[in-house]
From Swiss-Prot:
F-type ATPases have 2 components, F(1) - the catalytic core - and F(0) - the membrane proton channel. F(1) has five subunits: alpha(3), beta(3), gamma(1), delta(1), epsilon(1). F(0) has three main subunits: a(1), b(2) and c(10-14). The alpha and beta chains form an alternating ring which encloses part of the gamma chain. F(1) is attached to F(0) by a central stalk formed by the gamma and epsilon chains, while a peripheral stalk is formed by the delta and b chains. Its main location: membrane. The lineage of its organism: Bacteria, Bacillati, Mycoplasmatota, Mycoplasmoidales, Metamycoplasmataceae. Pfam families: ATP-synt_C. Gene3D superfamilies: lithium bound rotor ring of v- atpase. This is ATP synthase subunit c.
Amino acid sequence: MNSIVNFSQQLIQNFQEVSQRTAADSSNLKAFAYLGAGLAMIGVIGVGAGQGYAAGKACDAIARNPEAQKQVFRVLVIGTAISETSSIYALLVALILIFVG
């Protein structure tokens, strides 16, 4: 247990030293903000691929059973809206990092 406490204290100390060094150089801070924004937008790739896959499966389901079109479409729209929220949050984080950070 003592080693975990020592490790966490060393980790916090290292983070403080790094933050003090990077805060002294604002160009590094802006570069890290752009890097973080780019990394935040990587999550959007998975959302786009997942939505495309879901839309394809919905088209397959409607082609197999045209009478269930309304129910499949309703579930597709709800699922798309739910999965789109993560990409909107990623975009929001990226914009905050670029313009505020």
